[in-house]
């Protein structure tokens, strides 16, 4: 009996987190089918898990970035620029996929519900204005409100200032960073319980009956996201690492995408991505910045959502649009979505702005937002899974490509001579 108990405890504490999450997923579905009141009640577990992730993520980002920059040695290489380039390339590629698929399989909407209680941004200037204001936010306010642009700005500034600090100060910062990382690991071990609660309560509260009216729209949306995750992203990664990208792609989808799918927040998934980068032995100076930055600005999924829903509204209203205009829409949508990917459902608030490019009235555009919330059970989950798993995928691809260059000086010299 004791031996059996010991094996069970070992599985809980040290077992595969992915297997435990799958068990929690199945158990949540079963409970929702068996008892709706019980399933809604265990939703508390999901709320606590997501709340814990959101609580620890800002502190984790602040401490990791400060520690990373403060201890940065002169001449030590980081690879932020190549990762940012991949983020941009991935977002525009996703937008292009959404445009092409929307023209091949045009969707229409049933515009009945309005969402008058939501105030979307009035234009791209307002979006960029808000983004710039986020950079100069009060550090305490940024931590309390999970403003990752502001947190990164302060962390970078403090990190640079602390480069000249005494070694004992730097050691203290490292110890604080390690302590926060340990807390994060403990929180992540509760992921199976959190997923169990989220799945059970979501299915019990909403079901999937409302989604039947929008089957084609969902097929186009999720089809675009799968195409980006399984075709476009692997092509980008292959271009970077020059070997089979799928082991890395599937690892990122399995360990980052699954959790992000249920938390529906790129910000809440930052600790999961950080832990995965650490397991892969990536450069901490790089991933401590690229992961939180990606949670805010890497918006491939948001670009797909905005483009597909806006073009669905265009097709519904019978507006004729040419391919260059549709592509311009996707570019504008991708730029505007910057800063919205860290908020559950944030990309939907940019739809009225995108619709305004085609002269669609705001009241009609808000009905499109209403449709977005109806399908949000799947749309927002799939979007977040794509966004968050892409953060760690592109970070790993760039870090591994840099490691390969360092391991092969001849190839590096040949690259310089070209």
Curated annotation (Swiss-Prot):
Q: Could you list the residue ranges that cross the membrane? A: 21-41, 49-69, 83-103, 142-162, 190-210, 217-237, 299-319, 331-351
According to UniProt, the reaction catalysed is: L-serine(in) + Na(+)(in) = L-serine(out) + Na(+)(out); L-threonine(in) + Na(+)(in) = L-threonine(out) + Na(+)(out)
Q: Which GO-annotated molecular functions does the record name?
A: neutral L-amino acid:sodium symporter activity
Q: Which InterPro entries match?
A: Na-dicarboxylate_symporter, Na:dicarbo_symporter_sf, Ser_Thr_transp_SstT
Recorded topology in the membrane:
Multi-pass membrane protein
The function of this protein is: Involved in the import of serine and threonine into the cell, with the concomitant import of sodium (symport system).
* NCBIfam families, A to Z: PRK13628.1
Q: What is this protein called?
A: Serine/threonine transporter SstT
Gene responsible for this protein: sstT
């Amino acid at each position: 009996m004791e031996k059996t108990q010991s094996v069970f405890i070992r599985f809980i504490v040290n077992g595969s987190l992915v297997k435990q999450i799958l068990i929690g997923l199945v158990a949540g579905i079963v409970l929702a089918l068996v008892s709706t009141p019980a399933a809604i009640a265990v939703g508390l577990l999901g709320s606590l898990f997501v709340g814990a992730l959101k609580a620890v993520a800002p502190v984790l980002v602040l401490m990791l970035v400060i520690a990373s920059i403060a201890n940065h040695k002169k001449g030590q290489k980081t690879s932020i620029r190549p990762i940012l380039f991949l983020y941009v390339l991935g977002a525009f590629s996703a937008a292009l996929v959404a445009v092409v698929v929307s023209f091949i399989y045009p969707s229409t909407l049933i515009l009945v519900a309005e969402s008058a209680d939501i105030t979307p941004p009035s234009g791209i200037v307002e979006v960029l204005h808000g983004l710039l204001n986020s950079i100069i936010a009060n550090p305490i306010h940024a931590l309390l409100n999970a403003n990752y642009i502001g947190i990164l700005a302060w962390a970078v500034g403090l990190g640079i200032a602390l480069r000249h600090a005494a070694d004992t100060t730097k050691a203290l910062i490292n110890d604080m960073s390690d302590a926060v990382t340990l807390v994060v690991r403990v929180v992540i071990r509760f992921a199976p319980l959190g997923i169990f609660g989220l799945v059970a309560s979501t299915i019990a509260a909403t079901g999937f009956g409302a989604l039947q009216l929008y089957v084609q729209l969902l097929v186009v949306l999720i089809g675009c996201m799968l195409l980006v995750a399984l075709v476009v992203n692997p092509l980008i990664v292959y271009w970077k690492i020059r070997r089979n990208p799928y082991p890395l792609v599937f690892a990122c989808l399995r360990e980052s995408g699954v959790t992000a799918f249920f938390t529906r927040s790129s910000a809440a998934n930052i600790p999961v991505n950080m832990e995965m980068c650490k397991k892969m032995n990536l450069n901490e100076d790089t991933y401590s910045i690229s992961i939180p930055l990606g949670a805010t600005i890497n918006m491939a999924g948001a670009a797909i959502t905005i483009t597909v829903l806006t073009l669905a509204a265009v097709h519904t209203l019978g507006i004729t649009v040419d391919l260059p205009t549709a592509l311009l829409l996707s570019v504008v949508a991708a730029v505007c979505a910057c800063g919205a990917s860290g908020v559950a459902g944030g990309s939907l608030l940019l739809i009225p702005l995108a619709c305004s490019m085609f002269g669609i009235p705001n009241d009609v555009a808000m009905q499109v937002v209403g449709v977005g919330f109806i399908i949000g059970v799947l749309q927002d989950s799939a979007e977040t899974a794509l966004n968050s798993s892409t953060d760690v995928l592109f970070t790993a691809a760039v870090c591994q490509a840099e490691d390969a260059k360092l391991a092969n000086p001849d190839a590096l010299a040949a690259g310089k001579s070209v």
